[in-house]
Amino acid sequence: MRLFLLLAFNALMLLETHGFTDETDRQALLQFKSQVSEDKRVVLSSWNHSFPLCNWKGVTCGRKNKRVTHLELGRLQLGGVISPSIGNLSFLVSLDLYENFFGGTIPQEVGQLSRLEYLDMGINYLRGPIPLGLYNCSRLLNLRLDSNRLGGSVPSELGSLTNLVQLNLYGNNMRGKLPTSLGNLTLLEQLALSHNNLEGEIPSDVAQLTQIWSLQLVANNFSGVFPPALYNLSSLKLLGIGYNHFSGRLRPDLGILLPNLLSFNMGGNYFTGSIPTTLSNISTLERLGMNENNLTGSIPTFGNVPNLKLLFLHTNSLGSDSSRDLEFLTSLTNCTQLETLGIGRNRLGGDLPISIANLSAKLVTLDLGGTLISGSIPYDIGNLINLQKLILDQNMLSGPLPTSLGKLLNLRYLSLFSNRLSGGIPAFIGNMTMLETLDLSNNGFEGIVPTSLGNCSHLLELWIGDNKLNGTIPLEIMKIQQLLRLDMSGNSLIGSLPQDIGALQNLGTLSLGDNKLSGKLPQTLGNCLTMESLFLEGNLFYGDIPDLKGLVGVKEVDLSNNDLSGSIPEYFASFSKLEYLNLSFNNLEGKVPVKGIFENATTVSIVGNNDLCGGIMGFQLKPCLSQAPSVVKKHSSRLKKVVIGVSVGITLLLLLFMASVTLIWLRKRKKNKETNNPTPSTLEVLHEKISYGDLRNATNGFSSSNMVGSGSFGTVYKALLLTEKKVVAVKVLNMQRRGAMKSFMAECESLKDIRHRNLVKLLTACSSIDFQGNEFRALIYEFMPNGSLDMWLHPEEVEEIHRPSRTLTLLERLNIAIDVASVLDYLHVHCHEPIAHCDLKPSNVLLDDDLTAHVSDFGLARLLLKFDEESFFNQLSSAGVRGTIGYAAPEYGVGGQPSINGDVYSFGILLLEMFTGKRPTNELFGGNFTLNSYTKSALPERILDIVDESILHIGLRVGFPVVECLTMVFEVGLRCCEESPMNRLATSIVVKELISIRERFFKASRTTWR
């Protein structure tokens, strides 16, 4: 009986204790929730008294005592601060707050969690020092505080956490020296301290970390010789000490002492001496980066490292300009996994061995530029079929380009400048349709510029200056719409500058100086709105300087040594970014402007124009004569003529006004008829119309197998027009749907008079009766073989048969965004009447063979100058102007009129979707948490957390330049999505910003991996 009472008493006490402690955990978590930002708190909606504590989201309890042991709240978009109440969860073993938006400091109360083994607060916005209380958590195995804003030094108390297996402080603002107490962490396997501001030498106590296999110290300010302690860590697999201030020589036996290395990055330091030959004995080695040091001597053979994928030795002083310097390349043919080889900017001599053609078929990057290599390019270079980047510039290579080079169809970057290459530029270059940069400048190429270069539709930079080329500038080059840089200077080109130069609206640099070009400068040159550098000096151009006032961003202009005449245009004075203007040695005359760049005689050269006058004193020109008396006398006689002319003009204007009023009245009488019947004025401008029967045959009876898409007003079919043997897209309208006829008319009216390379081309229309006597309407467009942008952004939602075989690269997305922005700018600004698309979204952006974007579906488009209030409300009643949920501007939801600002909003959403991979209607979003706020909350530190993962593929090194470019893209998107229409960017600015971003990205991609 006594035993029974004792057991009952103990059970009662246990229940009371359990009830008390369970409530403690509950209150601690509710207090934690109260400190979470209100807009993020919905994620924790289950945290209330209606749910059992152990069923709360992210909460795991112990089996016996039902105390909270695990709190897993990673990647839930939570914000606010971390409540000190977290310290009351005394049974907590694991706390995961990874990748949220928590700010403030880490509460000292975390130190009360004596059972804690796993703590992850990485990728937040935490600041301040690491709290000293944390070091009471003596059971900690994993401590991750990476990618925050933590400051102060690495505390010596860290050494008391002797059970630590992983310590990650990457990407903070830690300062000072490493404490010697780190040596106490003898169980440590991973230590990440990269991207901080740590300094000093690595303490010798690190040698005690005998279990460590990953040590990352990259991008700090560490100094001294290669840390001697590291030679003792034979278990190391991943070692990164790059981009510090280390110096001195490496031990010859490094490869013996560290035999298990998979990755070794020591680039960007000040190491001297030779590369230890023992490194080639590490059979497990996959990545070796010793670039950007002061290493000398020969390069050892790496034939015994079969798994080597990356070898970076560039930017050193390796080699001795001898014929044997390149012998090591032959041994690399054994490295069948090699993807990246960078050995440029060294002192390597000798002929380029033919063995490079036998390197790994997986090779993507080959950089031998900036050395002393001679000989010719091996004929079998075409064996490297996966090569994307080939850099052989600044050498002494000679001879013609081998024909097998034309087999490198994946090549994106070909740099051969400053060699002694000869022969003609081969036509097979045009087969390399993926090329983005082609640099053949400063060689001995001769003959004409091949027209096949026009096939390289992805080309961003074309450098063929300083050769011996002749002939005219091929018109085909003017079709490369994405071209940013075009340099043909220093040749013997003849003929005129093509009128089509204005089609290169993305052009930033045009350099055609020192040729034999002639004729007048085309007015279309003023259409190159993104021009920054214009060099046309040393030619035979004549006539007036054309209207270039659209080039408001230009920085350098050189028109010297030509035969130009007329006056100096005043608009040069208004160019705020103009830094250099050379108009010397022409036949210019008249008054020199005195404002803007003309206020400084050192930035403007106008010598050799004998009839110029005026200007500031620095030009030392003769003063301009005032009006001669004879001119004054003539003035009165001209006055009568002016008065008569003005009178006649006013009379004509009055007559024209009366005629216009009459015409408007007549058109209003015809309004109802025109609403329901396509008039000849609408359709006759299109090609010859096609019959219902022809379309039925072309689509196999409108078969479902021919269907390629559907929308609110109809279905799109792929069709083969037998008469023209041409594949087209046929949009058949659902005439039962209210508003279908208005959609048909709007699309015809919108597209009949507009032409732009990024608009889908409307070929013709069909207005007929089907075989059952029903009204039939269809629009026939050119067919886009690569489908819609929507398919590429969300392939998981597409049937496998239509699914793209790969994902879009970052550069391809930028190009598509520029295409779409360009067409909006055209519709909004450059059409005779502004047009608002009103339904811009990924499914309405179609892609052709080259992934050039074409905007489609103008069923909701509005010709804004023809807009009137009555028609707007008629359209609104049929849901016409509302566009698509998620993409439509907020003002449309409250009766706002269609506008170009509404299109800008839709474009902003489109841009965010393109780079996050998330639709605005994603289930993640709701209430005030939208795609906009999701993006805004990640700027600027957490960009990579929201970027579409498919962008971050193996071919893209995610470094600071890439992150910077992505940040700028998102900022443009957010500025387009401003709530107030008046605060949104103009499309012209959007185009300019995106092109500038693309240039930044392109410049970053020109440098090899670091």
UniProtKB/Swiss-Prot annotation:
For this UniProt record, the keywords arranged alphabetically read as follows: ATP-binding, Cell membrane, Glycoprotein, Kinase, Leucine-rich repeat, Membrane, Nucleotide-binding, Phosphoprotein, Receptor, Repeat, Serine/threonine-protein kinase, Signal, Transferase, Transmembrane, Transmembrane helix
**Annotated ranges, domain Protein kinase:** 702-1002
Fetch the Pfam families from UniProt: LRR_1 (PF00560), LRR_14 (PF23598), LRRNT_2 (PF08263), PK_Tyr_Ser-Thr (PF07714)
- Residues of this chain annotated as glycosylated in UniProt: 48, 88, 136, 184, 221, 232, 281, 294, 334, 358, 431, 455, 470, 582, 600
Residues recorded with modification Phosphothreonine: 699
PROSITE patterns from the UniProt entry: PROTEIN_KINASE_ATP, PROTEIN_KINASE_DOM, PROTEIN_KINASE_ST
Q: Which GO terms describe its cellular component?
A: plasma membrane
Topology of this chain in the membrane:
Single-pass type I membrane protein
Q: Taxonomically, which superkingdom?
A: Eukaryota
Q: Which GO terms describe its molecular function?
A: ATP binding; protein serine kinase activity; protein serine/threonine kinase activity
Which cysteine pairs are covalently linked by disulfides here?
Answer: none
Q: Where are the LRR repeats?
A: 89-113, 114-137, 139-161, 162-185, 186-209, 211-233, 234-258, 259-282, 283-307, 310-333, 335-359, 361-384, 385-408, 410-432, 433-455, 457-480, 481-504, 505-528, 530-551, 552-574, 575-600
- State what protein this is by name: Probable LRR receptor-like serine/threonine-protein kinase At3g47570
